[in-house]
Amino acid sequence: MTMTHQQDLKGVFTAKDLDFKPAGKITKKDLNTGVTKAEYAVRGAIPTRADELKEELKKNPEVLPFDDIINANIGNPQQLDQKPLTFTRQVLAILEYPEILRVGHNELASLNLFSRDALERAERLLNDIGGSIGAYSHSQGVPGIRQTVADFITRRDGGEPATPEDIYLTTGASSAATSLLSLLCKDSQTGLLIPIPQYPLYTASASLFNAQVLPYYLDEESNWSTNSDEIEKVVQDALKKQIRPSVLIVINPGNPTGAVLSEETIARICLIAAKYGITIISDEVYQENIFNDVKFHSMKKVLRKLQHLYPGKFDNVQLASLHSISKGFMDECGQRGGYMEIIGFSQEIRDALFKLMSISICSVVTGQAVVDLMVKPPQPGDESYEQDHDERLKIFHEMRTRANLLYETFKELEGIECQKPQGAMYLFPRLVLPKKALCESERLGIEPDEFYCTSLLESTGICTVPGSGFGQRPGTYHVRTTFLAPGTKWIQDWKEFHQDFFSKYRN
């Protein structure tokens, strides 16, 4: 504030006005306890330490035993030099600056800056959006884009119809999940059935909305499969304790496990939902990331099959399915786009959801546009098709190659057990740590897998997440890693670290 402005305020208060002791600042104890209790390990203590080391590398690179930080803690491909899809970025460039379209299509195409189909898609999207991505959209999302999503779901599910009225365009899948949970978590007796291990968004949301976590454990020995009998037992135990199992979270393909659910398993999950009136939230953001001869089955497709086969038995199942532009081949994490499809909900619940979504006006409009590009990429015969197809194939092959290489590396190491990758972007190997390492972690006051991950980071620059951040069976220890980082040197570095670690702490 300038001296003149200070003088202007000089006579505002009397001596009596200023005769008080200034109140203290708010402290942590004044905050929402749901926030203070919530944990999100993906950006927790180890990634925070990685950021500190990254700054140290800039200032004093010679003091650390590595040259770079490998962010294997989060599924963020473009941070790790994955090239964006050309068609996507061409359309986005035009949407951001539609004056480009004042130049004729032929002239623009001759400059090799934009393909004709990118120009046409951008024109269609601008027309659907209303002329500018800087304007708010409908709270449920741009109607034309919702129609494109509905068409995609219909194709994906073998002709089972989807309608734009059931689609909400969202700011990523995370915002869809938290919006749904804020609506469905009525009180402290609401139970959320959450797979363990799980993506920590869900346990964090349970804390935020004061709900009860009802964990159901995945079976590691059978490739992290889901056991419906285990889920039903958790439901029955909760009911005995006067807890209402209201929401069942399913992550398919799994995060952090990479497991892909079979059609039969999904059917059994739907049966539990039908019997107990439990709403299913099916997190399907990795549906394109499928490896090694397994097949993705959407929850909605299986539910529709059951409704046809057993009339009346599954008609009341309420399902919200989530998808995102952050994964698959788009990997546009920073654009913040996604969708949810809701089916089986009554009109009064739909009205409440619409009101909730309207409070935040609308999702990011550029993110909505990228959703359109995700569900309707260039098709055979389009000018961009071959380039787009080749770029997607390259991403897929590189990801699958690194996934299998990392898996094979883990298989040959002492004290590490790993299930074969089926999907998603992660491996979740089990650590069988020497007693000496367990004692050292206890001395330091941290979990054994956190001790391992911290040692890995400090020795190699590889940033991972301890399994304790995702939940795991008591007495077991894991680490979650992506396989997104380019090259293979970091995998060799990890192998050498692991061998040295076990040599140091072997009983």
Swiss-Prot record:
Keyword Transferase (UniProt): yes
Protein's UniProt keywords contain Hydrolase: no
Binding site for pyridoxal 5'-phosphate: A173, S174, Y199, N255, S324, R336
Cofactor requirements of the protein: pyridoxal 5'-phosphate
Keyword annotations: Aminotransferase, Cytoplasm, Nucleus, Pyridoxal phosphate, Transferase
InterPro entries according to UniProt: ALAT1/2-like, Aminotransferase_I/II_large, PyrdxlP-dep_Trfase, PyrdxlP-dep_Trfase_major, PyrdxlP-dep_Trfase_small
Modified residues (N6-(pyridoxal phosphate)lysine): K327
GO cellular component: a single term: cytoplasm
Localization per record: Cytoplasm; Nucleus
Single GO molecular function: L-alanine:2-oxoglutarate aminotransferase activity
GO biological process: biosynthetic process; L-alanine catabolic process
Induction: Repressed by alanine.
Pfam families, A to Z: Aminotran_1_2 (PF00155)
Protein family (similarity comment): Belongs to the class-I pyridoxal-phosphate-dependent aminotransferase family. Alanine aminotransferase subfamily.
Function summary: Inactive alanine aminotransferase. Forms a catalytically active Schiff base with PLP, but lacks alanine transaminase activity, probably due to an altered structural conformation of the dimeric enzyme. This suggests this protein may have a yet undiscovered physiological function.
Subunit and interaction comment: Homodimer.
Note: Present with 3480 molecules/cell in log phase SD medium.
Protein name: Inactive alanine aminotransferase
Gene: ALT2
